[in-house]
Amino acid sequence: AANQHLCGSHLVEALYLVCGERGFFYTPNKVGIVEQCCHSPCSLYDLENYCN
């Protein structure tokens, strides 16, 4: 899949899809996934780094 910008609820939905039953860390106030995936495009591999 191509890299894409994912913000807010779109980012959460993508994490649910990628992580499934493993769940994930989502702390919007913490630097990390938002910078990586919202401010700049990220890949599904990047998202997997945030799964539990």
Curated annotation (Swiss-Prot):
Keywords tagged on the record: Carbohydrate metabolism, Disulfide bond, Glucose metabolism, Hormone, Secreted
Which organism is this entry from? Acipenser gueldenstaedtii (Russian sturgeon)
| The name this protein goes by in its record | Insulin
Q: For this UniProt entry, what's an example GO CC term?
A: extracellular space
Would I find Chaperone among this entry's keywords? no
Any one of the GO BP annotations? glucose metabolic process
Primary residence:
secreted
Subcellular location per the Swiss-Prot or TrEMBL entry: Secreted
User: What Gene3D superfamilies does the entry give?
Assistant: Insulin-like
The set of disulfide-linked cysteines is C7-C38, C19-C51, C37-C42
User: Which gene is transcribed and translated to give this protein?
Assistant: ins
Task: Extract the GO molecular function terms from the UniProt entry.
Answer: hormone activity
What protein family is recorded?
Belongs to the insulin family.
